[in-house]
C-alpha cells in the first residue's frame, strides 16, 4: 500500500540522515498545550528547531543570496526521494522534511526550480491526496508561510493531525447525515459534483470544498480563487490550502490571508511573537520556537494574531458575494461566415463544422436556432482557452491581413444573422474590481 510505503520511506531516510533523525526524535518530546481560538480547540507546539523557518528572511534580495535548499543539486547527500508524476508531465520529488512539525512530515518539491504557485498544480495536489490517502497535503502561498517561495512545493502529513481538518471533517459528516443544526458550514455554490461551503468558525476567510472528482473540484476551486482580491504585484491571492481524500471524495480547505506576519513579529515590545503563521498554524497547530512566548501565550493574544493575518470581514463578504451572484456577461462577436470550423478543447473531439441551412444552423445532422458551448471554467483570472475558431481574420485593412486559427477563453455562442453564421465569445466581467 502507498501509505505503508511512505512510512517505510521515512524510516529509510531517518536511518541514513542524522540531522533529520535527531529532529524527528526530538518531535516526540516537544511540549504541547491547548487553547481556544474562534471556537476551535487549537494546539501550541514549543518547537525550537522550527526557528529556521519562523525567522526566515523572505525578501527577494535575501532569497536571491541563498542556495535553494529544494533544488536537487543543493540537497544534502543523505537526502533520498520518491518520484511522483503530476498531470501534463509535471514531475515532483517526495522528500522527508528534516525540520518536522508532524510525524512522517513530507515535502513534495517540483523537480525543477520554479516559483511557488497553485495555478495548474491544484489537480496534482488532489492526485497526491488520492494516491497517498492516509495523508493530508497542504500548500503555503508564496506570501502565506512558504519558507521557499521561489521553489514550488507541497507538504504532506498524516491525516487527523490538524484541528481544523478534524473539525471540518466532523461537520461535513453531520451535513451528509442531514444534521445541519448549529453547523458552522453554510452552503454557497456547486459545480456538478463539487460543493462549496463557508466555515464560520476559527477565523474569517475559511472555505470548504468537497467533490467526488478532481475535475469538478478544480473548476470550483479556481472559481473561488478568482473571487478574491490579488495584492499588488502578486500572482495569486494569499492562501493556505489543504486537501485530503476520505469517504470517496476530495476535501479541500482554503484559508484566505491578508498578510504573512502580524505586527507581533516586528514588535520590540512585550507583545512580540516569533511566529510566522503558515499552513500548520492556520490549521490549529501553532508553532512557537521561543519558550517564554510559548508559556505566555493566551487565547486572546493568539486570536489577535490570527485575525490580523486573515482577510478582513469585508473582503470575506466580497468573496461570498462574487461567488453567489450572477456574473455579468459580455458578448463579443469574433467572426461571421457561411461555414464555421471550431474545436471545443475540453472534449478533445477535434474540428467540427456548422453551416447555414434554411435560415438555421446545421450542426451534427440537426438544425438549431443557436449553439452554445459552456466554458469549463467561468473565472477570469484563471481562465484557460476553451475553444478554437478556424480561419479568424486578423489585421483587417493592413498589409499583413491574414487568416489564422485562434484560441479563446469563455463560452462559444453561434447564431444566424443575415443568413451567415456569427461566432460570439461570451466572457464574464467584473465591474469595479482592481488589485489592492
Language-model-derived ranges and their functions:
Residues 317, 321-435:
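Conserved, single-site charged/polar hotspot
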Residues 150:
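Histidine-centered nuclease catalytic patch
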Residues 1-125, 135, 142, 147, ...:
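Active-site microenvironments that recognize anionic phosphate/pyrophosphate groups
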Residues 79-81, 140-144, 390-399:
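Short, glycine/charge-rich beta-strand/loop segments that flank catalytic centers
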Amino acid at each position: 500500500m502507498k501509505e505503508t510505503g511512505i512510512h517505510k520511506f521515512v524510516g529509510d531516510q531517518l536511518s541514513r540522515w542524522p540531522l533529520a533523525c535527531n529532529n524527528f526524535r526530538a518531535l516526540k518530546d516537544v511540549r504541547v498545550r491547548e487553547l481556544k481560538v474562534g471556537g476551535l480547540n487549537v494546539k501550541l507546539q514549543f518547537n525550537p528547531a522550527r526557528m529556521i523557518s519562523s525567522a526566515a528572511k523572505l525578501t527577494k534580495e535575501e532569497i536571491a543570496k541563498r542556495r535553494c535548499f529544494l533544488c536537487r543539486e543543493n540537497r544534502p547527500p543523505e537526502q533520498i526521494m520518491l518520484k511522483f508524476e503530476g498531470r501534463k508531465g509535471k514531475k515532483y520529488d517526495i522528500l522527508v522534511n528534516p525540520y518536522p512539525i508532524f510525524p512522517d512530515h513530507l515535502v513534495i518539491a517540483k523537480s525543477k526550480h520554479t516559483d511557488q504557485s497553485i495555478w495548474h498544480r491544484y489537480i496534482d495536489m488532489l492526485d497526491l491526496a488520492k494516491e497517498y490517502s492516509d495523508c493530508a497535503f497542504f500548500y503555503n502561498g508564496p506570501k502565506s508561510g512558504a519558507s521557499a517561495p521561489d521553489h514550488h512545493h507541497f507538504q504532506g502529513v498524516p491525516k487527523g493531525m490538524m484541528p481544523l481538518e478534524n473539525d471540518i471533517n466532523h461537520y461535513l459528516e453531520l451535513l451528509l447525515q442531514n444534521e445541519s443544526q448549529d453547523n458552522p458550514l453554510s452552503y454557497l455554490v456547486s459545480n456538478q459534483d463539487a460543493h462549496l461551503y463557508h466555515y464560520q468558525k476559527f477565523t474569517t476567510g475559511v472555505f470548504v470544498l468537497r467533490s467526488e472528482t478532481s475535475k469538478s473540484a478544480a473548476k470550483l476551486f479556481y472559481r473561488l480563487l478568482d473571487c478574491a482580491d490579488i495584492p499588488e504585484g502578486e500572482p495569486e491571492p494569499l492562501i493556505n490550502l489543504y486537501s485530503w481524500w476520505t469517504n470517496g471524495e476530495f476535501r479541500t480547505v482554503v484559508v484566505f490571508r491578508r498578510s504573512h506576519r502580524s505586527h507581533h513579529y516586528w514588535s520590540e515590545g512585550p507583545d512580540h511573537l516569533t511566529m510566522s503563521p503558515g499552513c500548520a498554524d492556520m490549521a490549529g497547530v501553532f508553532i512557537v520556537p521561543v519558550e517564554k512566548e510559548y508559556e505566555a501565550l493566551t487565547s486572546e493574544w493568539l486570536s489577535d494574531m490570527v485575525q490580523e493575518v486573515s482577510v478582513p470581514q469585508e473582503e470575506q463578504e466580497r468573496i461570498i458575494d462574487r461567488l453567489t451572484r450572477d456574473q455579468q456577461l459580455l458578448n463579443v462577436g469574433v467572426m461571421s461566415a457561411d461555414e464555421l470550423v471550431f474545436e471545443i478543447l475540453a472534449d478533445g473531439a477535434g474540428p467540427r463544422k456548422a453551416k447555414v441551412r434554411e435560415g438555421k444552423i446545421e450542426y451534427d445532422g440537426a438544425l438549431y436556432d443557436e449553439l452554445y458551448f459552456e466554458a469549463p471554467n467561468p473565472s477570469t483570472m484563471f481562465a484557460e482557452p476553451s475553444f478554437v475558431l478556424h480561419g479568424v481574420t486578423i489585421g483587417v485593412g493592413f498589409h499583413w491581413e491574414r487568416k489564422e486559427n485562434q484560441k479563446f477563453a469563455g463560452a462559444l455562442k453561434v447564431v444566424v444573422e443575415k443568413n451567415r453564421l456569427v461566432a460570439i465569445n461570451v466572457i464574464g466581467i467584473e465591474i469595479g474590481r482592481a488589485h489592492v
